[in-house]
Structures are given as C-alpha cells and as structure tokens.
C-alpha cells in the first residue's frame, strides 16, 4: 500500500503474474518494450510492435519533468526531449497519452505526475507519431474544456508537423493500430 494507491496489494483478486520487463519480450508476433517514466511512486511506458505497426501507452507520466530544456515556464525555448524517449516513440502509429493539464494549469500542478498538453504535442511532433489519443483528463474539466484542449492540441500539431492527427480518447473506444 502506497500513498498514491490506497488499495493493499493483497486485496486484489484474481491471478496476477509478474514479468520482469528489463528487456524486450515477445508474445507471438508482438514485441513489447518498456521504458521508465516520471510519476510519484514510479511508472512504466509501454510500446507494442506487431506486424509492422506500433502503439505506445503512456499515462501517468509527467513528461514535462523528462524535458532536457524548455517547457511551459520557458516558452521561448523549444522543448527538448531525451534521445531515448524520442527513439522509443519514433514513428509509432498510435500514442495513447495522458493529457491532464493545459499548459497554464500545469504550472500549478507540477510534480503531480501528469503532463501539459503542449509538451505532449511537441513530443508527438518530434517523434513523428501518426495518431495521438489524449486521455486521463483533469476530473475538474467538463466536456467543453476537454474539447477545447483537444482542438488546441490538433492546431498546435498541425503547425509543428506535416503528419499526425489528434483525437480525444473515450471510454469504450477501440483503436485500430495499422500501418
């Protein structure tokens, strides 16, 4: 039991298997890779490559704290990301990513474990991601605020990259990951 996850592990029901992810793992034709992110208590970013297509699941990762330079409080500097993060995301077809905060709100919520929309979009553009699905929105935001954030992200991406589309993820959504 930890401060950010109040349910004791022993209370979880069902069969739970653990797999050390210190190297790539193959399950059938899929290759699963991981890299550490930044979040209180730790977090892992997952990439699945399957038959020429790739998807990354990146939630509860405070990408702003992974920046080498730039960020919401230094708008005059471009955001600079670690090369290993850019390589990990490079050319993926789908990025499902935490996008809890606007750039303005992030300044008030630094170190809470979630990124700013500007950092998410800049990372996607620099990594040449195909489609971005924004998720894990601030629970205080209503549909209007979330829609505006998604629209702003789409506009920003269109100015930074000739490719890439922004979508709002929603509960029950099924995403086809193809080339």
How does the language model describe each region?
Residues 1-69, 142-179:
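Binuclear metal-dependent hydrolase catalytic cores
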């Amino acid at each position: 039991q930890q401060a950010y996850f109040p349910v004791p592990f022993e209370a979880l029901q069902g069969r739970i298997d653990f797999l050390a992810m210190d190297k790539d793992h193959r399950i059938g034709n899929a290759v699963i890779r991981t890299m550490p992110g930044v979040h209180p208590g730790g977090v892992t970013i997952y990439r699945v490559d399957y038959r020429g297509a790739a998807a990354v699941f990146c939630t509860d990762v405070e990408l702003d704290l992974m920046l080498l330079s730039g960020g919401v409080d230094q708008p005059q500097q471009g955001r600079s990301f670690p090369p290993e993060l850019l390589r990990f995301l490079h050319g993926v077809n789908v990025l499902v990513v935490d996008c809890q905060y606007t750039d303005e709100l992030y300044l008030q919520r630094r170190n809470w474990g979630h990124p700013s929309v500007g950092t998410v979009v800049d990372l996607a553009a620099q990594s040449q991601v195909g489609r971005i699905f924004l998720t894990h929105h601030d629970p205080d935001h209503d549909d209007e605020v979330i829609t505006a954030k998604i629209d702003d992200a789409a506009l920003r991406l269109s100015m930074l990259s000739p490719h890439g589309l922004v979508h709002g993820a929603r509960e029950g959504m099924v995403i086809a990951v193809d080339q």
